[in-house]
């Protein structure tokens, strides 16, 4: 027999801690999904703005955008 159950084994029940009690309400909404699109459009706008920001930084780094009054050495 590969597995065996022993009564009174060394397995103990999970302890209740103060931190666990404080974090329990955060996990109570697990698996629930709000109907509709929710904040998806807002996330899309944020991602687009971040992509624009990264492309501007990349252009400055590659010196393809020269800023007036700033010498790139």
From Swiss-Prot:
InterPro entries associated with the record: PSII_PsbH, PSII_PsbH_sf
The UniProt record lists the keyword Kinase: no
Biological process annotations from GO: photosynthesis; protein stabilization
Phylogenetic lineage: Eukaryota, Viridiplantae, Streptophyta, Embryophyta, Tracheophyta
Phosphothreonine found at: 3, 5
GO annotation, cellular component aspect: chloroplast thylakoid membrane; photosystem II
Free-text description of this protein's post-translational modifications in UniProt: Phosphorylation is a light-dependent reaction catalyzed by a membrane-bound kinase; phosphorylation occurs on Thr residue(s) in the N-terminus of the protein.
Main location: plastid
Subcellular location per the Swiss-Prot or TrEMBL entry: Plastid, Chloroplast thylakoid membrane
UniProt name for this protein: Photosystem II reaction center protein H
SUPFAM superfamilies: Photosystem II 10 kDa phosphoprotein PsbH
HAMAP family found in the cross-reference section: PSII_PsbH (MF_00752)
Family under the similarity heading: Belongs to the PsbH family.
Molecular-function GO term, any one: phosphate ion binding
UniProt KW keywords: Chloroplast, Membrane, Phosphoprotein, Photosynthesis, Photosystem II, Plastid, Thylakoid, Transmembrane, Transmembrane helix
Gene3D superfamilies, sorted: Photosystem II reaction center protein H (1.20.5.880)
A Pfam family matched in the record: PsbH
Gene from which the chain derives: psbH
Organism (species): Drimys granadensis
Spans through the membrane: 41-61
